[in-house]
């Protein structure tokens, strides 16, 4: 028999419920073969930052930055991954996206993607191997962020340094795996800035869907300005991303 879906709540659920609007959560697809795994170790909070995991790459340059073309930005999909969340029987109970934030295997995603998992399998573009892990390095249910780790050298995406203020109307590109469609790329603009439950969020129009959670929202310089976290079904292209300020905390 097919397993009952498990509802995952993102930080924006409370705000959305107040507006009687449905917030997108990751799909809970199918089944996969049973895989033996150890129990997931106790997770840390985002405040428990160790010296090893706190070095998120910030793009620093003394020269004038140049905007990238959409084609160049699409190539950054190689640093965005597809995450499948498995239960103790090896069944897939959810899917989402994640971004590489460190060369030593660190992947940032939404906490609502990683929560409830016994282990995780990660797919990387142009790599036929599927990487499994039980390592949740840190997580925070308030900011809806989590970091998992795989045993592979990665090519991280730089995080926006915040030196120039983001503005409405600014072009953005979203990369993720909506409905499991691996590393889809879409474009749009920043349509607003929201503070939901004391968490800074970016409202944007680039289309996302179930499975996009944890994916990258980039500026035109190829820097991560946010992490896709939710969208409202009843509104056209009303999507939310966790702001870069929370990523750097």
Where are each of the predicted segments found?
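Hydrophobic beta-strand signal
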Residues: 82, 102, 108, 173, ...
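Residues located in well-ordered beta-strands
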Residues: 97-99, 133-135, 184-189, 216
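Catalytic nucleophile loop of clan PA
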Residues: 99, 207-228
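Short, compositionally biased
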Residues: 185-197, 242-243
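N-terminal activation segment of mature serine protease catalytic domains
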Residues: 6-7, 11, 17-100, 106-110, ...
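Short beta->alpha transition motifs characteristic of CBS
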Residues: 102, 110-115, 176, 186, ...
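C-terminal cap/linker of serine protease catalytic domains
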Residues: 56-60, 65-73, 155-156, 178, ...
